[in-house]
UniProtKB/Swiss-Prot annotation:
Belongs to the ABC transporter superfamily. Energy-coupling factor EcfA family. Its EC number is 7.-.-.-. This is Energy-coupling factor transporter ATP-binding protein EcfA2. Pfam families: ABC_tran (PF00005). InterPro entries: AAA+_ATPase (IPR003593), ABC_transporter-like_ATP-bd (IPR003439), ABC_transporter-like_CS (IPR017871), ABC_transpr_CbiO/EcfA_su (IPR015856), ECF_ABC_transporter_ATP-bd (IPR050095), EcfA2 (IPR030946), P-loop_NTPase (IPR027417). Transmembrane segments: none annotated. SMART domains: AAA (SM00382). It comes from Streptococcus pyogenes serotype M3 (strain ATCC BAA-595 / MGAS315). Keywords: ATP-binding, Cell membrane, Membrane, Nucleotide-binding, Translocase, Transport. GO terms for cellular component: ATP-binding cassette (ABC) transporter complex.
Length: 280
């Protein structure tokens, strides 16, 4: 399922003293089966784009096209409902959306809300809970008795149970320890390998380098760079000027270059750095 934004602008709190422009004439494509990352400083418009992708917001001007279904400023909620089923949005702290009395009921709620039978919804819930590493002995527990990391996985399972074709992740590992973050990113990698389109907002450049195949860089509501991670992270000075930074190995390689060691193309992953050091 591909997504296309054509001349999209977004203004929040229109007609109030707090009115402000969040996005300016955004044009972009998210290809079917891709792993696309969005990076940018706070207030750059990343989260606004994420909420446009599944119809949580509608554009002030322009068109958001999801699998050839258009969302405009005039789109009605009932017209957008099918898009929300196919484009799952995982918020920064998704566990805050948990509310049912048991883990299993919470994950099954979404599919039932879209008309799936209780039996099929429960089967989906069990499948997706297993996928995110929640063991069966936790299914009947209250979600709020779980650890923070487990609650996050349950919330993500609830999104996956609705069988989205696109998974939109807004800082999905925020607040997790390194082990929990890596485990969650591995789950998303497996989903991508199975054919799901992944859209990631993150401030962790190593995750962009290790997982994404395309990157959009935003600044003050505009796209200032786009391309493959390898290409984007050659722009060390620009990214640091925008307070974004680069992957750790890229920063190390840049220091070597600054000391006179010739490196034709800065590595962005540990594997690439090993190759550079091996071959000189």
């Amino acid at each position: 399922m591909s997504i296309n934004l054509q001349n999209v602008s977004y203004t929040y709190q229109v007609g109030t003293p707090f009115e402000g422009r969040a996005l300016f004439n955004i044009n972009l494509d998210i290809l079917d089966g891709s792993y696309t990352a969005f990076i940018g400083h706070t207030g750059s418009g990343k989260s606004t784009i994420m909420q446009l992708l599944n119809g949580l917001h509608v554009p002030t001007t322009g068109i958001v096209s999801v699998d050839k279904q258009d969302i405009t400023n005039h789109s009605k909620n009932k017209e957008i409902k099918s898009i929300r089923k196919h484009v799952g949005l995982v918020f920064q702290f998704p566990e805050s959306q948990l509310f049912e009395e048991t883990v299993l009921k919470d994950v099954a709620f979404g599919p039932q809300n879209f008309g799936i039978s209780p039996e099929e919804a429960e089967a989906l819930a069990r499948e997706k809970l297993a996928l995110v590493g929640i063991s069966e002995n936790l299914f009947e527990k209250n979600p709020f008795e779980l650890s923070g990391g487990q609650m996050r996985r349950v919330a993500i399972a609830g999104i996956l149970a609705m069988q989205p074709k696109v998974l939109v992740l807004d800082e999905p590992t925020a607040g997790l320890d390194p082990k929990g973050r890596k485990e969650l990113m591995t789950i998303f990698k497996k989903l991508h390998q199975s054919g799901m389109t992944i859209v990631l907002v993150t401030h962790l450049m190593d995750d962009v380098a290790n997982y994404a195949d395309f990157v959009y860089v935003l600044d003050k509501g505009k796209i200032i760079l786009s391309g493959k991670p390898k290409t984007i992270f050659q722009q060390v000075s620009l990214l640091e000027k925008k307070q974004l930074g680069v992957p750790k190995v890229t920063k190390l390689a840049q220091r070597l270059v600054d000391r006179g060691i010739p490196i034709s193309s800065l590595p962005i992953t540990l594997e690439e750095l090993r190759e550079v050091l091996k071959h000189g």
